[in-house]
A protein has these predicted regions:
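Pyridoxal 5′-phosphate
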Residues: 1-243
Length: 243
């Protein structure tokens, strides 16, 4: 639904409609979405939806798989007799993790509206901070945004930096520099950051070979403020001059 590296939000209702026309089961990864607001599961055009608690303030190691009633049968194991979780799986529940996830769900504010081609997120301080960042860098030729600005997760920023010679700066240098200055950012998705291979997503959006290891990902939260964005922008300029 929301791409983790470049923040792109997919037209899930349109995709879901096409899948239904072709009698295709549609599983949707909503991991990046739920922290930005609640939405109507009943109206969402998919068969399965997976969510991860740590993405909306809950504990790691617990998640949710929502299934539409008509689609649930496909998950049932026909060869083994299971008695728990609607005959889908066995296992002892991690009650502390479930309780933590439940409390985090109660803290999610705002409502997401879903249309055929767009997902409309509630206007809040996080979205305003993201727009403020993009506004401040729009004339800086040393910052190259990756992904769409308009069809993007409201808490997501991704870019690569070019030095004074307009050469891409390796992401690990920026991540380490920011870490030394008490700012936590990422150089890629958790799924692929340890593989050492360039991201297929970045390849597919047309980044050059020397840019594939330079993408930076920043996730904003409710505790962030404008002065922190300003400080981050100052450190970005130091990186441009330094590396």
């Amino acid at each position: 639904w929301g791409q983790s590296e470049i923040g792109t939000v997919q037209p899930v209702q349109f995709i879901g409609s096409k899948c239904k026309e072709l009698n295709i089961m549609f599983h949707l990864d909503g991991t990046q979405i739920l922290s930005n607001g609640i939405f109507s599961w009943k109206d969402l055009k998919c068969d399965f939806l997976s969510l991860s608690a740590h993405k909306f303030g809950g504990p790691k190691g617990i998640g949710i798989l929502l299934t539409k009633e008509k689609s649930r049968q496909i998950l049932k194991n026909k060869d083994i007799s299971l008695t728990q979780e609607f005959s889908i799986r066995q296992g002892t529940q991690a009650l502390p993790l479930i309780a933590g996830m439940y409390e985090s769900l109660k803290n999610i504010k705002g409502k997401i509206k879903i249309y055929d081609y767009i997902t409309e997120f509630p206007s809040n301080n996080i979205k305003k901070l993201k727009n403020y960042f993009f506004q401040k860098i729009k004339d800086n030729n040393h910052i190259k945004i990756t992904g769409s600005i308009n069809h993007r997760l409201p808490n997501h920023i991704s870019f690569l930096l070019l030095n004074k010679l307009f050469e891409p700066i390796r992401a690990y240098k920026i991540v380490n520099f920011m870490s030394d200055n008490k700012i936590a950012i990422s150089s890629g998705s958790a799924c692929s950051s340890s593989s050492g291979k360039p991201s297929s997503t970045l390849k597919n959006i047309g980044l050059k070979d020397d840019e594939l290891y330079s993408n930076i990902r920043v996730t904003l939260g409710s505790i962030n403020n404008k002065s922190e964005i300003d400080k981050f922008l100052e450190l970005i300029q130091i990186c441009i001059d330094k590396f």
